[in-house]
């Protein structure tokens, strides 16, 4: 599973997915099972029953749709209560990251929290400082929140299309010179849709597409991936390639599982090219956050980067260029939000909060 919260804001939440021959489960029940596992492990570690929970949430589960956004939070709250939590509190993830950063400050400053994960990019402009640490009510210190449903999985999708799926016929030509249908490749590059390609009806449809290809090697490779259910493996290799070139350089993607000797290369410049639109959308969301606050760009002291996708040099550089007077601070990409949620929980519940 990846970017599991993304399902909350989609129409898929009440739909079912096949988890074995003839066995189906609702996506919402997957979320419930995930939370139940977390609760069980946490209770075993703490040797106590946990009834209260602080859950992080993106600024927007769904872009530009307050009704669906509210439904997404309601679905997550339902899942939390279904596993036994009786008191459920939500906190914006970038606000949680700001609380983590605040623990290190020695003076008051304005920080733009940049939290780019797998499913969403979230931003908060927050006033932080040692004099604020013990305050539970921070409404006046939160100057703006904003976010966009574009992040790491969108990068992965573009990388897979441009590298791995290019070797399977994405943008290949047919006998008439026209490009082969792209929908199959879009589905193969979209994590939660990969399983749909394994449906027997869909597999038969793909077999009939053999004559759509001028070079049948692409069709053979595609059918091997579908019949041997290699879709998620390819997605993981595309993600690994993205990570490998995130700080520069070149990598090789081993696709021997499809065909011996099939090893396309991928480099940072290709990454820059294929994710440009996604990066620009994220940068625009950061700018909009500051605009909503009414604060001059020059007054921002710090950019606090957290979330796994901020490890991409091209993204962090693009964001830093927008705010040249601010220093860049990198938090724990995978734990800042969780640490901040713990801080918030300790302020809400005091001794009841579990370390």
Show where each model-derived region lies.
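Membrane-embedded alpha-helical bundles of multi-pass transporters/translocases
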Residues: 352-353
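Conserved phosphate-binding/catalytic loops in two-lobed NTP-binding clefts
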Residues: 83-91, 298, 317-343
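Nucleotide/phosphate-binding catalytic cleft detector across ATP-hydrolyzing
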Residues: 1-113, 132-135, 210, 214-264
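Small-residue (GG/TT-enriched) beta-loop-alpha framework at ligand/catalytic clefts
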Residues: 75-102, 115-125, 131-161, 165-166, ...
């Amino acid at each position: 599973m990846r970017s599991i919260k993304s399902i909350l804001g989609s129409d898929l939440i009440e739909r079912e997915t096949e988890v074995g021959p003839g066995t189906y489960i609702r996506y919402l029940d997957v979320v419930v099972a995930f939370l139940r596992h977390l609760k069980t492990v946490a209770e075993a570690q703490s040797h106590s029953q946990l009834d209260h929970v602080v859950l992080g949430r993106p600024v927007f589960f769904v872009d530009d749709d307050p009704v669906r956004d509210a439904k997404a939070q309601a679905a997550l709250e339902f899942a939390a209560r279904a596993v036994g939590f009786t008191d459920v509190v939500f906190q914006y993830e970038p606000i949680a990251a700001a609380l983590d950063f605040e623990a290190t400050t020695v003076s008051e400053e304005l920080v733009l929290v940049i939290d780019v994960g797998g499913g969403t990019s979230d931003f908060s402009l927050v006033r932080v400082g040692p004099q604020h640490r013990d305050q539970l009510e921070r409404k006046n210190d939160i100057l703006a929140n904003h976010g966009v449903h574009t992040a790491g999985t969108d990068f992965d999708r573009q990388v897979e299309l441009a590298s791995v799926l290019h070797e399977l016929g994405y943008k290949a030509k047919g006998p008439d010179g026209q490009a082969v249908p792209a929908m199959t490749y879009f589905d193969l590059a979209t994590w939660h849709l990969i399983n749909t390609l394994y449906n027997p009806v869909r597999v038969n449809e793909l077999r009939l597409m053999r004559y759509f290809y001028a070079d049948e090697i692409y069709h053979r490779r595609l059918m091997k991936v579908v019949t041997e259910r290699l879709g998620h493996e390819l997605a993981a290799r595309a993600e690994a390639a993205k990570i490998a070139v995130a700080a520069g350089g070149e990598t090789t993607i081993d696709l021997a599982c499809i065909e011996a000797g099939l090893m396309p290369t991928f480099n940072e410049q290709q990454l820059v090219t294929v994710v440009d639109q996604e990066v620009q959308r994220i940068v625009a969301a950061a700018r909009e956050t500051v605009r909503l606050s009414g604060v001059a760009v020059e007054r921002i002291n710090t950019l606090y980067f957290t979330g796994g996708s901020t490890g991409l040099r091209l993204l962090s550089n693009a964001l830093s260029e927008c705010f040249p007077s601010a220093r860049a601070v990198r938090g724990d990409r995978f734990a800042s939000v969780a640490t901040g949620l713990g801080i918030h929980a300790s302020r809400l519940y005091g001794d009841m909060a579990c370390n």
